[in-house]
Amino acid sequence: MQLSALTLDRVNRPGSSSGGCTVTERNYLDFRIDGCSVLNILTSTDGTHSDFMTPFVSGFPQQHQTFVADLLCRDLPEGGAARVIIYICPECGDIGCGAYSVEIERSDIGIVWGSFAYENGYESPLPISDIGPFLFDPDEYKRIIIEAPALC
């Protein structure tokens, strides 16, 4: 498996208010793999809307630390894997509104993202095929994830 490049990109979700409906402005970091937005890859493959954001959203520093720990799989032994929510509802952050997740594995060759899925917390995750797996250099991956909260 070839190494992929993980980067983060600042994104602004504009706010608005019309007809009694308010959309909250959000600034967040989007995951990019080899230059492509992971959200765009997921929504174009899955055929759903793209109104999601990562938990690296401005104004929620406590959430950032939890997300960093989840992405680094700190509690897993090498060879272990964990499913991590990577995109959430931009209004409330509740998985019940729908979310995208990925299985993250710490292997002897690096960090692997695979088995992407859409989930809502009350049904089994719905696998999204034809995406990944992606292999990342473990040191570079760790650096990017640890530095992310400072970029929010």
Protein language model regions, located:
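Intrinsically disordered, low-complexity acidic regions enriched in Pro/Ser/Thr
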Residues: 1-152
